[in-house]
């Protein structure tokens, strides 16, 4: 299913030097977001920096949101993850998409202009209303918390 989302280009290098965010394959869930910076940035070990992507989106549909997620290779190979772990883009947000990059490794990491730094995934949203109850229907798990469902 293809959903049309309004995208505003904030950096005129997009479409000329760097492509619009696109899906790499027909099975890709995420669109790559790039570092639209003026020059390379070295992120020191333990440091967090905020990187512009050069775009903003307006989802408009309250049944959709977007999440900014880390790229698996950056995290596994280099210790580069999102400073806020997951970025949530609400359907009514219209500002620039920024990526909080955290270097959790013990070595500096350099982000070059145009590097793919994160991915944007659109997800369905269900807004809930609460029924106030005094007891829940019993389940086999009950109140079992972390690790309660076992290892196997």
From Swiss-Prot:
Pathway: Pyrimidine metabolism; dUMP biosynthesis; dUMP from dCTP (dUTP route): step 2/2. Its EC number is 3.6.1.23. The keyword Magnesium applies. Substrate binds at residues 71-73, 84, 88-90, 98. It catalyses: dUTP + H2O = dUMP + diphosphate + H(+). Signal peptide: none annotated. SUPFAM superfamilies: dUTPase-like (SSF51283). GO terms for molecular function: dUTP diphosphatase activity; magnesium ion binding. Keywords: Hydrolase, Magnesium, Metal-binding, Nucleotide metabolism. Its cofactor is Mg(2+). It comes from the Bacteria. GO terms for biological process: dUMP biosynthetic process; dUTP catabolic process. Belongs to the dUTPase family. This enzyme is involved in nucleotide metabolism: it produces dUMP, the immediate precursor of thymidine nucleotides and it decreases the intracellular concentration of dUTP so that uracil cannot be incorporated into DNA. This is Deoxyuridine 5'-triphosphate nucleotidohydrolase. It comes from Haemophilus ducreyi (strain 35000HP / ATCC 700724).
């Amino acid at each position: 299913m293809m959903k049309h989302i309004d995208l505003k280009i904030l950096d005129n290098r997009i479409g000329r030097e760097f492509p619009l965010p696109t899906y790499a394959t027909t099975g890709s869930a995420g669109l790559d977001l790039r570092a639209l910076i003026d020059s390379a940035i070295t992120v020191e070990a333990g440091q967090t920096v905020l990187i512009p992507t050069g775009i903003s989106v307006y989802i408009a549909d309250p049944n959709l949101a977007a999440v900014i997620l880390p790229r698996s290779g950056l995290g596994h190979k280099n210790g580069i993850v999102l400073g806020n772990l997951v970025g949530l883009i609400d359907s009514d947000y219209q500002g620039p998409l920024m990526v909080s990059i955290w270097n959790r490794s013990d070595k500096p990491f350099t982000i070059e202009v145009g590097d793919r730094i994160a991915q944007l995934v659109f997800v369905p949203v269900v807004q809930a209303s609460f029924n106030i109850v005094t007891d829940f229907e019993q389940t086999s798990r009950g109140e079992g918390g972390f690790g309660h469902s076992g290892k196997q």
